[in-house]
Amino acid sequence: VSAGQSRPTLEIAVTSAAGARVARDHGADRVELCTGLELGGLTPSAALVESVAAVGTPAQVLVRCRPGDFVHDAEEIALMTAEVRSVIASGARGVVIGALTAEGTLDVEAVARLRDAAREADPAAEVTLHRAIDVAADPVGTAALLPALGLTRVLTSGGAPAAGQGL
């Protein structure tokens, strides 16, 4: 809860415009849009982002090009950089991103590149670190790096397989 805010911000994960409407109608302040929830979440299409943006609830869009780990090669980072630009251009208010090195540390260069793509597309875009933090070698140390990178939000399950288990 921010200063002057009377209640916490409610963000609900959705996979469709219909889900975004339900979230809006039940008091969501914003939605996080992705596809492939059973795979840990994947980047939705530009058309899906547009349809969710049309609902009117601010959307944060997950940018993740494949299931599995969060260690991405140069080709995948280039793809996700293009996806960041695409989802912002399609109406996303922000992106949910992340990348780790093979050693389990935050891939600062990749995260900075994705952040830069978002802010070039929209200087007001919010950039959130996703659940890569939950499998990082040092989650607390990883979180400490985020302010210097300009990331102000973290999507986490508290290090557990599901958020309810990590509370």
What are these regions (language model features)?
Residues 25-34, 55-59, 91-94, 119-124, ...:
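Glycine-enriched alpha-helix->loop->beta-strand junction motifs that scaffold or abut catalytic
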